[in-house]
Amino acid sequence: MSKILIIDDDLDILETMGSLLENEGFEIHSADSVQKGMELIDSVSPDLILLDVMFPEKKTRGFEAAAEIKAKHPKIPIFVLTAINREYAFDFNKEDVKAEEFLNKPVKIDRLIKLIRNYI
């Protein structure tokens, strides 16, 4: 069973997305902060990470976390999720943030599942 780590400070997102992905047969692990997510990566060894961009800790913490994760775990695909406005979001691209995919919230679950299956 493929493992997905969801890192998002929105508990509703963690619960809803986690439940939907579990129903698709994925093993879900979740963290409500970047720090907790970083701690889980080594113990869980996820096959893919869904990472929110905006955290209360720091405005660009999600982008920084993606780069840090890629430095330590270059083979784990990262999907960056954001609800920030399009102008700001498009100032960044996949290469800048070290992510395989960059998705705007609300994410269409069928599209997300298709993308996940393409990577794992």
Feature-to-residue mapping (PLM):
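Active-site beta3 strand of CheY-like receiver
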Residues: 44-50, 55
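Alpha4 helix (beta4-alpha4-beta5 surface) of REC/receiver domains from two-component response regulators
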Residues: 61-64, 68-71, 82-103, 110, ...
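Non-catalytic signal-transmission and effector/linker regions of two-component phosphorelay proteins
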Residues: 1-3, 108-120
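Conserved sequence signature across two-component system core domains
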Residues: 7-8, 31, 49
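His-Asp phosphorelay/catalytic-motif detector in bacterial-type signaling
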Residues: 45-47, 72-77, 104
